[in-house]
Amino acid sequence: MRLKMPYGISNFEELITENYYYVDKTMYIEKLENLPEKRIMFLHPRKFGKTLFTSVLENYYDKEKADKFETLYGKTYIGKNPTKLKNSYCILRFNFSGINTENEESTMIGFKEKVSISIDGFAKKYGIDFFVNQEQTTEGIMRSLIEAFKLQKPEDKIYVIIDEYDHFANELLGFYPEHFRNLVSKNGRVRKWYEILKEGTETVVDRIFITGVAPITLDSLTSGFNIGTDITQDVRFNEMMGFTKNELIEILNSQDILKEEQEQILPIMKENYDGYKFCLEAKNQIYNSNMCLYFLNRYIEFGKIPTKLIDVNIASDYSKIGKMLDLCKGENRLEILRKTVQGEPINNNIVEKFNPTIEFNETDMISMLYYLGYLTISGEDLGMPELTIPNKVMKQIERYSEFEDIKDIEGLRKYTIVVAGNELYIEEI
């Protein structure tokens, strides 16, 4: 039976049990576990499979999923080469996407709700006698859980997984920077929550894995958290997310797509979805996995190359997060966008932590374009990364960003992004 394309599927158990194709990334479980550091941060642009990978970790390490190990991982690398820590943790998972960031109050309510739901589910799943007291602060709820776990589960350890740690923070920073600063400042509620999580690493929290897009909140949060290691630019993990060319060909073969057809569609996919490199030493470029699955899902369903090569969800997602570029107020912002759209390479060191309390400079903005996926590493000059637009799709999206900047400067009327065929167009509202 031909396996289904997992477009939009981010739950690993669902993907395996409901016969979706899985590009095996489980060898990276072993690589992560073998690192000396136990607290890991991994940043990538949107739509590269980060949420699915956190689900892979969750199912692998969850002690309550031991009886499902063979079903879920039997055909994978890690199923044939299990590590000593498999199915040995209580998994506490948070996902901070979907929070209403209209104002500080709604943001904090949403953050507390996300934390409360995760903690309540965790307590019920692992049989912890614990009540989420909504009268407590968010950090108070976290502290109480850690204390209850320590008393009731002295033999167990917690693996904390935080997906999209910066999602709501990025939206705040792009649209309401003052709200952002208040929440992550020294006395901010979000900052205090991370401080309690840090305290937990001294007792019951053994491992942490965090995903996000940009290190925009790291400088604000981690002086209180001291997160271990950011492996974003570690060559060993360049291919942990997204697809390599060989992985993409394996997908095509699994769908019985003939070689003649592959020769027709692979150049199109390469031109539009390939081109990403996240560290200087990497040899292989990476395809955006979500864009590839969008294309293949339609190609298989309709038997022809899709008319629209750009997923409208991706286009709107990137244009929305691109609001963070407004942090750079200098005149060079527009010039940088124009240079990149014209295909000119830019040599620039990549900033590892942003400080949003001060105005972004040119280096910060170029680095932000790299983290958001607008630019990628294409080479080096005297040890400095050379950055260019990775593919045609991102070039179209960045042209939209350039137009938005012109609109802001010239005070024109509001416009919106429209996907038509293989192009992005600007339409007056």
Stretch-by-stretch model annotation:
Residues M1-E398:
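Phosphate-binding site recognition
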Residues S401-I429:
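Nucleic-acid nuclease catalytic cores
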